[in-house]
Amino acid sequence: MIRKTPNLQNDIINIQERYSNNLVMDVGGGRNSRKNVNFRRPPPAMTSENSKHELRRTFSSQKRLMIPANYFSLESLVILVGLTASLLILPLVLPPLPPPPFMLLLVPIGIMVLLIILAFMPSSSSRAKDVTRTFM
């Protein structure tokens, strides 16, 4: 059994039609006292200019629904791909390097210790102390 799937454009149009048809709400307390209240505006008289504007608005709203947001620009994507390729290829091409001197290894450790000390050090500004009291 082969089932055909409808295309995405028809699904979007069907969802929009269902949404616009379901704007009628039931209002009332009991089963017999329900009233149909329509919150839709009456359609304005259609002129050729209005219909063109409506058609443009429909197409632009469909484009916004269908196109996902781009998180990376083209330049940042090229940089990301280039950096990834270099990190994969350079270790295979370069010869193994000797370890750095011991004193050079202490530099990042010293920077980390300095940042930890500065993070827990109280500030000397009385204004900053007032700000921290309001949050505690």
Swiss-Prot record:
Residues 72-123 are annotated as: Organ Size Related (OSR) domain. The keyword Repeat does not apply. InterPro entries: ARGOS/ARL/OSR1 (IPR037468). The chain crosses the membrane at residues 77-97, 101-121. GO terms for biological process: cellular response to auxin stimulus; positive regulation of cell population proliferation; positive regulation of organ growth. GO terms for cellular component: endoplasmic reticulum; membrane; nucleus. Keywords: Cytoplasm, Developmental protein, Endoplasmic reticulum, Membrane, Nucleus, Transmembrane, Transmembrane helix. Its main location: membrane. Mostly expressed in cotyledons and young siliques and, at low levels, in roots, rosette leaves, leaves, inflorescence stems and flowers. It comes from the Eukaryota. Induction: By auxin (e.g. NAA). It is a multi-pass membrane protein. It is found in: Membrane; Nucleus; Cytoplasm; Endoplasmic reticulum. The OSR domain is sufficient to promote organ growth. Belongs to the plant organ size related (OSR) protein family. Promotes cell proliferation-dependent organ growth. PANTHER family: ARGOS-LIKE PROTEIN (PTHR36023), PROTEIN AUXIN-REGULATED GENE INVOLVED IN ORGAN SIZE (PTHR36023:SF16). This is Protein AUXIN-REGULATED GENE INVOLVED IN ORGAN SIZE.
